[in-house]
Amino acid sequence: MYTQGNPKLWTGRLDSETDPKQFRHFQTVKFANLENMENVSDKTGVGLLGYAVDKGVENNKGRIGSRKGPDIIKHEFAKLPDLSECEMLIDYGNVEHTSNHLRETQQEMARLSAKVIKQHKQAFLIGGGHDIAYAQYLATREVYSDASIGIINIDAHFDTRPDEPPTSGTMFREILDNDENVDYLVLGLAQGGNTRALYDYAKDNNIIYVYADELLHQVSPTIKDKIERFIHDHDTIMFTICMDVIDSAFAPGVSSPSVLGLYPHSVFEISKRVILSDKVSSISIAETNPDYDVDNRTSKLAANLIHHFLV
């Protein structure tokens, strides 16, 4: 079910009502109904769409609560200063899970996400469970029907399980098994978070991956080159971040916390190498779970990711 944006989430410190240089995002955001949107010829500004769904996490036997993530992240983002001089920032609201099957909700999210991608220079899709990535893929394929898609996932897990029904850990296998024009790069993989069967699947399907311990301090030129070559080799890039890749000292509020995860600055550095490419069609941030957060630490981190990614 689609619900429009909630203006009550968008509050913060008011430094000035007249000087744009003192504005924060809550002073510049606008709201719109995706169901009434008409196609545009030129992409402009930034669109936000939430995926207030944790059914996939529940199916994956994870800690539920990430359905609350989009609203909390938007609220934290609203407080941050407007430094990008973004020409347009629109909150389109959320998609919620009210149907009998997760797939139906993913398809609804995909339909609406495609509209955001077509409308904006930057489309931010905010989870919710990481099964948002399947909706993100469907939307990307709708917009770029014949393109080669490169999926870049900063994540502790492959998320290529063969389980049924679909979960927050199956979506990339579903994509790779059904679309030969997609490749997959995982950055931040936890050695203790993936079985041998998943490594075998990765080998059989040419999945490129980098372990978390290769990214702990400074991103090496070799890894930077790997990311840049992957981007170069594809027509469009679908970028997704699972917040559980970040060490639980910094991101405790996730569905599956990491004890040997990445530092936030490593995620920022890696992400900047991706975001700078005009091939990036959409960005999703998944698995923030406010029920397990401490001082809104994880939601603030997710909000700051969006803030730093604005171009």
From Swiss-Prot:
Mn(2+) 1 binds at H130, D155, D159, C242. It comes from the Bacteria. It catalyses: N-formimidoyl-L-glutamate + H2O = formamide + L-glutamate. InterPro entries: HutG, Ureohydrolase, Ureohydrolase_dom_sf. Its cofactor is Mn(2+). Its EC number is 3.5.3.8. GO terms for biological process: L-histidine catabolic process to glutamate and formamide; L-histidine catabolic process to glutamate and formate; putrescine biosynthetic process from arginine, via agmatine. Binds 2 manganese ions per subunit. Pathway: Amino-acid degradation; L-histidine degradation into L-glutamate; L-glutamate from N-formimidoyl-L-glutamate (hydrolase route): step 1/1. It is an enzyme of class 3 (hydrolase). Keywords: Histidine metabolism, Hydrolase, Manganese, Metal-binding. Mn(2+) 2 binds at D155, H157, C242, D244. Signal peptide: none annotated. It holds the Pfam family Arginase. One of its GO terms (molecular function) is formimidoylglutamase activity. HAMAP family: Formimidoylglutam. Belongs to the arginase family. Catalyzes the conversion of N-formimidoyl-L-glutamate to L-glutamate and formamide. This is Formimidoylglutamase. It comes from Staphylococcus haemolyticus (strain JCSC1435). The lineage of its organism: Bacteria, Bacillati, Bacillota, Bacilli, Bacillales.
